């Protein structure tokens, strides 16, 4: 990235650049010593850009509206100063009251924030109490949790509004209010809840709005909660080679499954991967398809219990699982980033047009009812996986189904290349001439793939990013096509519905009945896996093994490490035992016939 030079040919630092002063440390920010111990335990070396800017302003009591990219440490940026102020207040007064309210759009993000509070307060847990109101417990249990006036309450706007109206949650002593992922909160339909919280909340409360984008929704929240806030537009400069490498593949509808099979079977992607699909049924169809080849994966969707979803994310971050198939049901409409070029007004107009087009396309899709009404399980409105959740060390984001807007695309690929790491985003696009050519694998949203791709390319170009074509050697890929066809035919609609029912039933049992057991025996939680085979599809054992003649040289090295060795045509070890058993049985049968007087008796005439 080129930088402007002053009169002396010295580079001028850009606004919000990543040039943080070398002497800025967590200790120099004036945080409590117990918090510094908790930070050190998390192996945080130095504050990120958003942390170094936001923490001092929050400690000064300023309202803040901060925009920073995903994975930049926004959660710690607002939690640390809040925890510091709570500890300082407790030194002067022992009165227990709720002083901080943190609003988030999804249950998964609420659980993540709660665990972050626990990690930072490891050395002062007795002095700071936090409650997560998004857990699936009865109203009586929630009232009992709030009766002790916890210092920090983490909730969705709906839960906070409900408990505030019933006087279970007291906001009389509130000093800090945070809205995390502010641009997403209103899109989840929390408008009335936020207005209700704003009415109940006392005046003079310090407000922090954190977001990856600054949209019209954020401006609405700014007018509702903030008083002359300090606006931080932070753009961390990426080093050469860092960030997300973006690729796109144009293919037929059934070729999505073929390419996915080849990618994972030949290990073309190294590391952990998140696969985004358009709906819940696609989750199970793809999982059952991959199971045919022995590739295990986990599922995330809104019909699974919240405890199971949270546990899947935790185990994924611990490297227990390598592949997650997630349904992105709460896509956000419109484009997000502010223009950086000189033609700002023109670009803003283009963005506004794109946002309207995205909204129109989405409305058209929602108005078209499905021909067959299927009984579906109850969806969790507070589910969200493409925003806010901190998936660790994700090597690749695979857009199996392209999102319906460039903004949703940006949020999806933000799950990789977090905190200065590198990552890859690969998207499958269906050309218009290929749409509905393979009806069993077709999806309605693919109709607009080419239009959405054009918006994505344009949007990424404004940010200086390029979406490159990813070229597969289709001659070598075609060798796997007949195996893909066998597996895909086995995954019928009935098999998908059976798998969905079985999975939800299993996860409900794991989530509810065993919750108390795992609280008492945390060691047993290790054995609770979510990537087991569903097995309602027709089992074809031969598909799990790739014949040597199908493997290209590069693929052979990737899957076997270059050492194939000798593979015999017969099972030498097991057959020896089986042959011996068969021989013994044969001996027994032969002796039996000889000793049978009815079969061996020979009548001879007397001479």
UniProtKB/Swiss-Prot annotation:
Residue window of motif DEAD box: 180-183
EC number: 3.6.4.13
Motif (Q motif): 24-52
BP term (GO), one: maturation of LSU-rRNA from tricistronic rRNA transcript (SSU-rRNA, 5.8S rRNA, LSU-rRNA)
UniProt keyword terms in alphabetical order: ATP-binding, Helicase, Hydrolase, Nucleotide-binding, Nucleus, Ribosome biogenesis, RNA-binding, rRNA processing
Biased composition (Basic residues): 578-592
Gene3D superfamilies per UniProt: P-loop containing nucleotide triphosphate hydrolases
UniProt-annotated stretches for the region Disordered: 332-380, 573-607
Tagged with keyword rRNA processing: yes
Compositionally biased tracts (Basic and acidic residues): 332-343, 357-368
Ranges of compositional bias, category Acidic residues: 344-356
Pfam families the record matches: DEAD, Helicase_C
Location of this chain's protein in the cell: Nucleus, Nucleolus
Transmembrane segments: none
GO molecular function: ATP binding; ATP hydrolysis activity; DNA helicase activity; DNA/RNA helicase activity; RNA binding; RNA helicase activity
Reactions catalysed: ATP + H2O = ADP + phosphate + H(+)
Broad EC category: hydrolase
Sites where the protein binds ATP: 68-75
Domain spans labelled Helicase C-terminal: 243-475
Family: Belongs to the DEAD box helicase family. DDX56/DBP9 subfamily.
Free-text comment about domains: The Q motif is unique to and characteristic of the DEAD box family of RNA helicases and controls ATP binding and hydrolysis.
Protein name per UniProt: ATP-dependent RNA helicase dbp9
Lineage, highest ranks first: Eukaryota, Fungi, Dikarya, Ascomycota, Pezizomycotina
């Amino acid at each position: 990235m080129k930088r402007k030079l002053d009169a002396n040919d010295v580079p001028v630092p850009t606004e919000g650049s990543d040039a943080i002063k070398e002497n800025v440390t967590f200790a120099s920010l004036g945080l409590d010593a117990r918090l510094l111990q908790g930070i050190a335990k998390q192996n945080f070396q130095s504050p990120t850009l958003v942390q170094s800017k936001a923490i001092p302003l929050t400690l000064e009591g300023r309202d803040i509206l901060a925009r920073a990219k995903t994975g930049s440490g926004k959660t710690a940026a607002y939690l640390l100063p809040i925890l510091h102020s709570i500890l300082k207040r407790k030194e002067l007064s022992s009165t227990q009251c709720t002083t901080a309210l943190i609003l988030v759009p999804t249950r998964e993000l609420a659980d993540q924030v709660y665990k972050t509070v626990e990690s930072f307060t490891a050395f002062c847990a007795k002095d700071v109490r936090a409650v997560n109101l998004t857990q699936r417990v009865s109203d009586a249990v929630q009232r009992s949790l709030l009766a002790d006036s916890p210092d920090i309450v983490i909730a969705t706007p709906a839960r906070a509004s409900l408990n505030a109206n019933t006087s279970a949650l007291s906001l009389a002593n509130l000093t800090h209010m945070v809205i995390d992922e502010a641009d997403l909160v209103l899109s989840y339909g929390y408008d009335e809840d936020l207005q209700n919280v704003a009415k109940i909340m006392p005046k003079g409360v310090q407000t922090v709005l954190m977001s990856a984008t600054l949209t019209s929704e954020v401006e609405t929240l700014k007018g509702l909660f903030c008083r002359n806030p300090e606006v931080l537009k932070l753009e961390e400069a990426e080093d050469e080679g860092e960030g997300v490498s973006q690729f796109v593949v144009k293919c037929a509808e059934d070729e999505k499954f073929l390419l996915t099979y080849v990618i994972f079977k030949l290990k073309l992607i190294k590391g952990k991967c998140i696969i985004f699909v358009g709906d819940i049924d696609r989750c199970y169809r793809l999982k059952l398809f991959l199971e045919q080849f022995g590739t295990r994966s986990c599922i995330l969707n809104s019909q699974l219990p919240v405890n199971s979803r949270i546990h899947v994310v935790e185990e994924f971050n611990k490297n227990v699982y390598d592949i997650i198939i997630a349904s992105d049901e709460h896509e956000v409409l419109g484009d997000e980033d502010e223009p950086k070029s000189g033609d700002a007004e023109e670009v803003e107009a283009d963005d506004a047009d794109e946002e309207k087009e995205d909204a129109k396309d989405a409305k058209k899709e929602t108005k078209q009812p499905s021909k067959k009404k299927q009984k579906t399980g109850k969806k969790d409105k507070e589910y969200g996986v493409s925003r806010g959740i901190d998936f660790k060390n994700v090597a690749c984001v695979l857009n199996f189904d392209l999102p319906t807007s460039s903004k949703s695309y940006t949020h999806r690929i933000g799950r990789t290349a977090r905190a200065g790491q590198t990552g890859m985003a690969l998207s499958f696009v269906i050309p218009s001439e290929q749409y509905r050519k393979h009806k069993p694998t077709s999806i309605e949203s693919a109709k607009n793939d080419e239009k959405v791709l054009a918006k994505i390319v344009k949007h990424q170009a404004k940010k200086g990013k390029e979406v490159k074509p990813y070229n597969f050697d289709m001659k070598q890929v075609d060798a796997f096509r007949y195996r893909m066809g066998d597996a895909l035919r086995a995954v019928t609609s009935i098999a998908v519905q059976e798998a969905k029912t079985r999975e939800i039933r299993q996860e409900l049992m794991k989530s509810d009945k065993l919750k108390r057991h795992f609280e008492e025996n945390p060691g047993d939680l290790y054995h609770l896996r979510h990537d087991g085979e569903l097995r309602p599809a027709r089992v074809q054992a031969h598909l799990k093994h790739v014949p040597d003649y199908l493997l290209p040289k590069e693929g052979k090295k990737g899957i076997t490490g270059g050492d194939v060795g000798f593979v015999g045509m017969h099972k030498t070890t097991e057959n020896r035992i089986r042959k011996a058993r068969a021989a013994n049985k044969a001996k027994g049968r032969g002796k039996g016939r000889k000793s049978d007087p009815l079969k061996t008796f020979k009548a001879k005439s007397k001479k």
